[in-house]
């Protein structure tokens, strides 16, 4: 049974939206699950109005489908969807790393080093949720170092799609071991102001992830969908 816990700092409709979104992104509410307003309002102890508004927002995000007769349900995310995301990430993340290497402060360098080190330590005690949390934190912090709100908004949506895919498919912990080394290389290039290398390392990181997803598609026998 799903456990919903709403924090009180934000408007109720925003809290409902964020809670449902989190559960979809982390796979707690699985693909194809129907989202019943009555059921959700009872579980979350709220009226149907914020539930309805949240479902509409999630549909705008592409996380929920709304169809006549069938109603609202959680959208699928396929290997092809993820490869499409990586096509975007290939250009964006290289630029992000390049810009971060030019703008990062001394304090931010220390924090980025800390996050990369925490990730490296986390993979020694495989905990999927913790590893994914630190992976997301690493990439988000590099964006923060760019001090560019427009760029932050652009990449936020792309990273959210990646987050959902991680929870659904990333069960091979050997993949995370190689990712840790890539994070260290990116971090060092950014911290040392090696702009071209920062971009190259970030590009290589995304290409490695894209290859991992492509090979995963082969294993799942969905290769026709990704070519």
Regions of interest found by a model, annotated:
Residues 18, 76-121, 129-143, 156, ...:
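Amphipathic alpha-helical segments that line or abut small-molecule/effector binding pockets
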Residues 81, 108, 127-131, 147, ...:
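Residue-level recognition of alpha-helical structural elements
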Residues 9, 113-120, 125, 160, ...:
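C-terminal all-alpha effector/ligand-binding and dimerization domain
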Residues 1-102, 144, 150, 210, ...:
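Short linear motifs at protein or domain termini
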